[in-house]
Amino acid sequence: MESTQVIDWDAEEEEETELSSGSLGYSVEPIGQLRLFSGTHGPERDFPLYLGKNVVGRSPDCSVALPFPSISKQHAVIEISAWNKAPILQDCGSLNGTQIVKPPRVLPPGVSHRLRDQELILFADFPCQYHRLDVPPPLVPRSLLTIEKTPRIRIESQNSRVLLAADSEEEGDFPSGRCVANGQRNTASPSATVVPESDEEVSSPAPSVPGPSSPFGLGSDTDEEQGQQPGVEESSLADSSGAAGEAEQPEANGTTAGIQAQPTEHKLKDTKVKKEAGRAGVSDGSVLERSPTLGEDSDTEVDEDHKPGFADSETDVEEERIPVTPPVAPVKKNQVLLAVGIGDPEAPGVAHLQDCLAGSGTDVEDKTALDVPLERNHTPMVINSDTDEEEEEEEEVSAALTLAHLKERGIGLWSRDPGAEEVKSQPQVLVEQSQSASGRDSDTDVEEESSGRKREIIPDSPMDVDEALTVTQPESQPPRRPNDADEYMDMSSPGSHLVVNQASFAVVGKTRAQVEEEVPGPSVILGEKHQVPLEGAQPPEEAWETAVQEGSSSPEAAASVRPSQQPVAEDAGTECATAVSEQESTLEVRSQSGSPAAPVEQVVIHTDTSGDPTLPQREGAQTPTGREREAHVGRTKSAKECCDAEPEDLCLPATQCFVEGESQHPEAVQSLENEPTQLFPCTLPQEPGPSHLSLQTPGADTLDVPWEVLATQPFCLREQSETSELHEAHGSQPSLPREPPGHQHLVHTSPVHTELLRIEGREIQTVEKAMGIPKEMADRMTPEREPLEREIRGRTENSERDVIGEELIQGTKDREPKKVLARDSQRKEADKDLEGNRESLEVEIEMSKDSQKRERKVEKPEPKREWEPADLEVTPDRGVTEEGSHDQKGQIASLTLKPGVGVKDLEGLASAPIITGSQADGGKGDPLSPGRQQRGRLSCQTTPAGKASRGDPEPPDHCLFSSVPEASTQSLLTSQSQKQSTPQPLFSTSSSEIPLPESLHTKPNVRPRRSSRMTPSPHSSAALKPNTTCPTNQPAASRPTSRPTRGRANRSSTRTPELIVPVDPELQPSTSTEQPVIPKLTSQVTEGRVQMPEPLLTGPEIQSPTSTEQSVTPDRKPRATRGRPSKSPNKTPEPLISTGPELQPPTSIEQPVIPKPTSRVTRGRPRKSSVRTPESVVSTGPELQPLTSIEQPVIPEPRATRGRPSKSSIKTPESVVPTGPELQPLTSAKQPVTPNLTSRASRGRSSKSIRTPEPVVQTGPEFHPSTSTEQPDTREPSSQARTRRSAVKTPEASVPTTPELQPFTSKKQPAPKPTALVTQGRTYKPSTEDCESVGPVAPDFEPSTSTDHLVTPKVTDQSLTLQSSPLSASPVSSTPDLKPPVPIAQPVTPEPIPQANHQRKRRAAGKQGSRTVPLGHKSYSALSEPEPQSSASQSSGASEADSPRQKRPRRQASQKTVVIKEEPVETEVKEEPQETAIPTPEKRKRDHAEEVTQGKPTRSRRTKPNQETAPKVLFTGVMDSRGERAVLALGGSLASSVNEASHLVTDRIRRTVKFLCALGKGIPILSLNWLYQSRKAGCFLPPDDYLVTDPEQEKNFSFSLRDSLCRARERRLLEDYEIHVTPGVQPPPPQMGEIISCCGGTFLPSMPHSYKLHRVIITCTEDLPRCAIPSRLGLPLLSPEFLLTGVLKQEATPEAFVLSNLEMSST
């Protein structure tokens, strides 16, 4: 990269000398600072950098003294020749080397590297970030600024200097990672005017060239990032710039920056300056202002430095609000503005801003080939702009709230997003900010889309025009109807829409979600109104599409369209906006990536949606596009109908689609940011994150995630994540989804992005627009959806599985398509991108996503999360899609009804929360997306029937939406869900989800959205809960946690969403009549798993009756449960699920409850809770959620564990998948699910996400409470199919287990269940086969299965979110409870039982591992019960035992009984006695058989029974991936510290801090053989036989480990001791303090000044002079060996370790 290069010192010396001489006088003040990120070494620190040479090294006399062993005495030198010159970094021949993080590069000694602002540097293993301080010297700065040469020379350093470069810079920052630095720097930058920007820009290499720098910079940045095509970027940039300039400001970047700056000047001086400096500069500026906050995020997301920067920037902008616009406006934004101005004279400000934002994003995208830079830049800008204007216009209050949210959440988002993927982050941020701006922004975007579609964004730029043309093609569809146009636009416009909208929309979407939470109605309304008029000016479809296609305008157009729809449904609008925002963000990012091509691609995506790709990629997407277009048209029509019935709905779906995209986008974006070239792929991943994330995940809160997210969850992110991978998988899958345009939306979306799907279904938005997309998709796809779905189904099924191989490759494409699916646009863009550089990017993104998802939380986590989320996401997507497809066919009638409004609205609602989740998790959103996708598909299908069935759905949806912000919304949603049950399938879940989200969302959204990614995640979780469940799971898996949380959350999100989708819809349809009951159930289930079920027609059928029946039971319980979510919830959830239907009206209640719990849980421990809750929620839906709440705390742990388990989680999903598919097949209705499953299976990872949903689906359908649950289960498995093992297995295990397990698990669920899940995930691989077995069983069992499924979903969820798992189980339990009501299942029981057994085994296995005993028990119990049926028993027994217990005992009894029962089955021996009561023999046999079949059954049940909770294993002194996998496969989790660990694994006795702490606490210290043997046995074996043996060390220290452990358990060694450790002691005082605390002593941080018995000072000879006071007081001065040796021997003998007077005197 240009960053690191040998410098021609001769040529530069003169210049530098000159500069330095001029600036030497300023050496007094630091020119920059080097930030050392916090870590095990200590807190974060900033070192000032002055003119001249700043030596970095271990020596105390170094300017930057890093006193760490791995740092050489003189490690490196940072030379600053002049204040405005880029510092030169040189390695001084250090031992461990100096590395540039972005792009990764080791700096050879003697080679100079120009440091860019915010650039990340790795000194040995210590990550640092260079920040340029904006302290422009009076003279030098200007001269330097004047000197083009310098800027050029310091391409990276001085990018900011060049105004044009600024644009590039932003892009550059993205790739370079300057973003982080920029964020911080930018703050200063504002004051510095151009120079600071210059600096910031400087940080971006691209901007080095002043004039061309903008385009060049973009290219350059891109280059830096991924070596994208600068030419393209330039042309794209130029185009965008030109267009923007023409419309807004003739001048390109500079002018644009200026103009934009003017509006935002007051708020965003930085932005302005930055803008002036360049787009990147502007973004940076925005970021900078928020830099401190963002900076941290940035720091956190060091990996995604630039991206974080962007994210930061976005956040900043959003926070600043005004800055938002300006930053967005700078280059692309300006262009966008231009487009807006042209397109939207009516609402010039908002439209303009939005356009700027969206357009800018698009423009930037168009303008710059560098997707990443632009994306990043763009996204933030979009958010800001949109948010800014719209918020201002909409409501200052809203704005304030949004801002607060944004800040809260933005920051969280930032951290996650940037971490997950900077690009993603940015989109997420955008979304988040947008959401923050809330509905406004999103509204604006949406409105703009509405208007924007009318907006004639065509003028934007040639590219834009091109896009417009492309759009026009889709426009042929627009004729369908304005609304249709909107919807279509959504689909059609998705490409450009995605492109622009993604960036813009990401903002909008997030904002919308946020606003929705904050002020759902108003924001949306305002934005919508505002924008609608703008957009309205032009023909809705045409203008809109044109705008969308235009690229710059495109996003806005897309947003516009959506808003247009949104106007109809304000809440939906908000949601829509959010979706749009997200999508826009994604698109924008993508567009940016695509640059000219990208815009076209975006357009293509739109076109794809339209059915007419502009670009080859588009063409690639085109095929799907045609179909998609059809689907879109169908959808659009459906949407239109809905729209007619309820424009809001339509809007929502469309918007939501976008949101999903956004979610995806953020993650993707972030991912892209990480990899400029791979911008698009990243963007796709971003969908999740979650998702991502985290929607972006990650998440957005997963925001995760994740970025991915958290992801996004990315994005997700982090989660997506989780989302990214899903996206990717989906992306691969896209081939599957891609095939049918309509489908593509759904399917693709799902593949692309579970989130996307959701997006399409609005799932993304909601939770993942859980409903939105379905609605839109359903609407549009409904007509052709069936065919498409069939096609897709077949295709998806085959495709999904086949695609798995292809997936990565196609994944990139597919992912894009998925995104597009989410937003056709997005998909298109993805396709285009994909084709452009998607594949590599996709792969990278997938990895990135994985990473990002985890990363969303932290870059590291992000990757895991990213791919996991992606996987999850993809899986859900695919699974959902497939399932949805199949199911949809069946349910199309039902679903369709709802899609229009219900889905959309719900989705919108869900979406908002989801977005949050998505953002947080990146993955979160995504997860929902998949569900939503399914839902969307379902929705479409259901729509007709649903519509017919529920004529109300739309209105309810609206109401729902309106209420969304509030619990009432949830209620409405629920109601709606019920009403629009069919549609709601998508929606129902959504509903559930949405209510959750709404309530959660609303509540938490505001708070969590920004507040914390995690929180949002939880909210998302809550909101997503069903969704989030997935997201959570996903996050757990990856999404995000999208970012971790993000990734995990994302993933969970994805998964959950899927679950949710099916459940809700199915239940909902069923519930139509019983709606209240079923919906709730559905909600729950939906949330949990009904989603999937929804696809299962059976589900609904059964569901109605069952639902009612069960519903009632659960209803009560759920409430009770709700009251005491934890235990009760377990039980309750069971009832709850049943109740779901009943509750569904209650769903709203339940949902509220869930949201509450979720909220609570989520809020309380947003991330974990989120994850867990969502899972719980998913299964139980509302009930579960409460449960989750309660359990969530536990779950969170797993969650944490999940951070790593994430993978496990993912795996689990895989296992699940088989089950899913089989289960799915079992459920005829579920069969669609099966495809999903398959898809998922193919997806593998995606599976995770999907997985939960899958189980849910199955269960859902089966039960619909039961079926629903089952279907979800199936679906989940489906989803999980991707993550086949876990999913399948989990579902199976889950299914059987769940019923009983759930109750049982409920209580213990947190620990055990998740473990089981994880284990299942892993274990499930074998399970797959079982799953299949189970599959058949499930159908037989249908109700039973449903329960099983439910369980599975739960398990799956759990798998995804280990922690969540328990909750999941709970829901499952619920199902069982329901099941008793539905003895139907009992007959089936036998088959299901095996299934259950399998699942149980798996689950148990999984759980045993983590939760070990409890889970096992639960799992087994549940399984067992279900198995022998225990079905009957369960039903009966559960009924009897559970009946009474059902409410609570059920859980308890169930747990116990279940545990016992199940355990016997699985454990056969252990639980046999207990299980005997319940058809133990039969069950056991079955179980056994299944277990045998699965091969892992053993492990699950037994261990769990043995251990109440899954072991939390900590490793010390060994890095053993095999052992870690064994832990996760067995359902255990990986502890991050001794405090949470239940077992320590090492290879020998060593006096490490962890070892001594564990010994002090009496924790078993085991050898690796324990894990290996446990893995073989399928459960965690008793630890006593596997204690570490090290005779040599025991001899050396004269102690026996076994004896010491016994003594430590009997009594803590230092119980009465108060100990102070002086600073010079080794290990250092903090670690000694940890040992002291673990041994029961009290650590005194400061020197004591009084005497007390057993108060001692641990010191060393060097510190003896410090000990004069204690020495006078007579306090014993002991050597460190008192502690080190004393703990080993478990003997406290101070007198033996007193430092002698001799030593003291000598000292």
From Swiss-Prot:
PROSITE patterns: BRCT, FHA_DOMAIN. GO terms for biological process: DNA repair; DNA replication checkpoint signaling; protein localization to site of double-strand break. It holds the Pfam family FHA. Residues 9-18, 386-397 have a biased composition (Acidic residues). Keywords: Acetylation, Cell cycle, Chromosome, Coiled coil, DNA damage, DNA repair, Isopeptide bond, Nucleus, Phosphoprotein, Repeat, Ubl conjugation. CDD domains: BRCT_MDC1_rpt1 (cd17744), BRCT_MDC1_rpt2 (cd18441), FHA_MDC1 (cd22665). The modification N6-acetyllysine is found at residues 769, 1496. One of its GO terms (cellular component) is nucleus. One of its GO terms (molecular function) is chromatin-protein adaptor activity. Residues 2-222 are annotated as: Interaction with the MRN complex. Its main location: nucleus. It is found in: Nucleus; Chromosome. There is a cross-link at residue 1461 (Glycyl lysine isopeptide (Lys-Gly) (interchain with G-Cter in SUMO1)). Residues 264-278, 369-378, 626-642, 719-730, 778-804, 812-868, 875-889, 1459-1473, 1481-1493 have a biased composition (Basic and acidic residues). Residues 1-23, 166-328, 369-398, 417-497, 520-642, 679-699, 718-746, 778-899, 914-1510 are annotated as: Disordered. Residues 1378-1393 have a biased composition (Pro residues). InterPro entries: BRCT_dom (IPR001357), BRCT_dom_sf (IPR036420), DDR_Transcriptional_Reg (IPR051579), FHA_dom (IPR000253), SMAD_FHA_dom_sf (IPR008984). The modification Phosphothreonine is found at residues 4, 146, 222, 300, 315, 362, 387, 444, 470, 1056, 1132, 1173, 1234, 1297-1298, 1352, 1375, 1480. Phosphorylated upon exposure to ionizing radiation (IR), ultraviolet radiation (UV), and hydroxyurea (HU). Phosphorylation in response to IR requires ATM, NBN, and possibly CHEK2. Also phosphorylated during the G2/M phase of the cell cycle and during activation of the mitotic spindle checkpoint. Phosphorylation at Thr-4 by ATM stabilizes and enhances homodimerization via the FHA domain. Phosphorylated at Ser-168 and Ser-198 by CK2 in response to DNA damage during mitosis, promoting interaction with TOPBP1. Sumoylation at Lys-1461 by PIAS4 following DNA damage promotes ubiquitin-mediated degradation. SMART domains: BRCT (SM00292), FHA (SM00240). The modification Phosphoserine is found at residues 168, 176, 198, 220, 298, 313, 360, 385, 398, 415, 425, 438, 442, 461, 492-493, 591, 593, 595, 735, 750, 885, 929, 962, 991, 1104, 1126, 1128, 1327, 1359, 1435-1436, 1439, 1443. Tandemly repeated BRCT domains are characteristic of proteins involved in DNA damage signaling. In MDC1, these repeats are required for localization to chromatin which flanks sites of DNA damage marked by 'Ser-139' phosphorylation of H2AX. Histone reader protein required for checkpoint-mediated cell cycle arrest in response to DNA damage within both the S phase and G2/M phases of the cell cycle. Specifically recognizes and binds histone H2AX phosphorylated at 'Ser-139', a marker of DNA damage, serving as a scaffold for the recruitment of DNA repair and signal transduction proteins to discrete foci of DNA damage sites. Also required for downstream events subsequent to the recruitment of these proteins. These include phosphorylation and activation of the ATM, CHEK1 and CHEK2 kinases, and stabilization of TP53/p53 and apoptosis. This is Mediator of DNA damage checkpoint protein 1.
